[in-house]
A protein has these predicted regions:
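N-terminal presequence-like segments and the immediate start of the first folded domain
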Residues: 1-65, 69-82, 88-134
Length: 134
């Protein structure tokens, strides 16, 4: 089997947060085969770099802004996202999330799922990952 070349990209404050909480190399963004893979991002507090509980709409906006920042660090953009996965602790937040999401994808949504999960290991309600074309 042919080896796939991957490049990990550091994006602060996300990289430092992941390193403080996990063992082993974990990166918020990896590129491979002409694609950008953004790891699941909770809503990091921009001032502290820590995941924190905020009102849900604010969590959604912060998370999507972070995703945009990660994509741009890799040389891509929201317009090049082909798949987006949303993990949320409350299915009743579906419409509320969609209102925020639509502002980031005004010309049409990528393929996506909105999955309800039990809980996260932190004080937040939302995590988003995506795949984009370079």
């Amino acid at each position: 089997m042919e080896r796939v070349e991957r490049s990990a990209i550091r994006v602060e404050p996300f990289s430092s947060y992941l390193e403080r909480r996990r063992t082993g190399p974990i990166f918020p963004v990896v590129t491979a085969g002409g694609f950008v893979f953004v790891s699941g991002l909770p809503p990091f507090d921009p001032a502290t770099g820590e995941a924190s509980r905020r009102p849900f709409r604010e969590q959604a906006q912060i998370t999507l802004e972070q995703m945009k920042r990660c994509l741009e660090a890799a040389g891509s953009s929201l317009e090049r996202v082909v798949e987006c996965n949303i993990y949320c602790t409350d299915a009743a937040r579906f419409d509320e999330f969609n209102e925020v999401f639509a502002r980031y994808f005004p010309s049409g949504s990528p393929a996506r799922i909105f999955l309800c999960v039990g809980a996260f290991p932190g004080s937040f309600d939302l995590e988003v990952d995506c795949i984009a074309v370079l």
